[in-house]
């Protein structure tokens, strides 16, 4: 088999993987509540033993009950942060065994609300004391793609979007709302380092690499809209600097070693990166990505776009 043929086959396998398993972010089933506290706090099996005076800060994690969001909450708590999660689900999905622990006090403050509604975010920040926001809201297949029901099988959170779940509303609008509120909050409180961490995608940088625009040109329209939404948020965050410190992570495929169903896609991404396809970055474990994001929040010198080399440096590979 020639090198060209091998690369073509890997590229084809990668494109299939991209279409079906690109990412595992969360957007939970809808609720009519603007922003409320669920009846219980859910256990994430991590305890924050630091006092408020020792804490590196207090953060709001948007989409904190999803695949990546839960990992960020756990890691942030372990690093000493005070953590509030906002999602439409309110509480993360729990097994029957885990549900028996709900009466125990845990340190992550889970709130139920819709980040498409600005009031949901501003109400939480108005409580004061926040030093950063992490945006982990997203979805692979939106309602306009005609494939939204497949999210139950390819989404890390197994969420099914509602009729109003489009890339523009879920990715762009929720992030724009949060960025605008964060900017106002930082100015009002005279904060010199309010961090905003956004989960973008490696493919958002395709225009800057060889072959990127060519590959993007053959993607279905719904995947192009996915990338348009990511890029619009990146631009919005950059425009908000230096009032807020922009942290933009661009992971490739996000996976977890305890989910073997993702290994087909992971192998395709690793193979494409190994043979030198410039438009394919290495996959990253959800644990490594979460650690990267939390370390970036703590380190005031970290800002801008973080691709795989930076993710590997900050968060490792495990």
What are these regions (language model features)?
Residues 1-38:
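N-terminal chloroplast transit peptides
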Residues 81-88:
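Conserved glycine-rich Rossmann-like NAD(P)H-binding loop of the short-chain dehydrogenase/reductase
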Residues 268-284:
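A conserved pocket-lining segment of Rossmann-fold NAD(P)-dependent short-chain dehydrogenase/reductase
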Residues 92-188:
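NAD(P)H-binding glycine-rich loop region in Rossmannoid oxidoreductase-like domains
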Residues 57-81:
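N-terminal Rossmann NAD(P)H-binding glycine-rich loop of SDR-like oxidoreductase domains
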Residues 174-177, 229, 280-296:
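Substrate-positioning beta->alpha
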Residues 206, 244-272:
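Flexible, glycine-rich beta-alpha linker
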Residues 60-62, 89, 146-228, 239, ...:
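Conserved Rossmann-fold NAD(P)-dependent oxidoreductase catalytic core, especially the SDR/UDP-sugar
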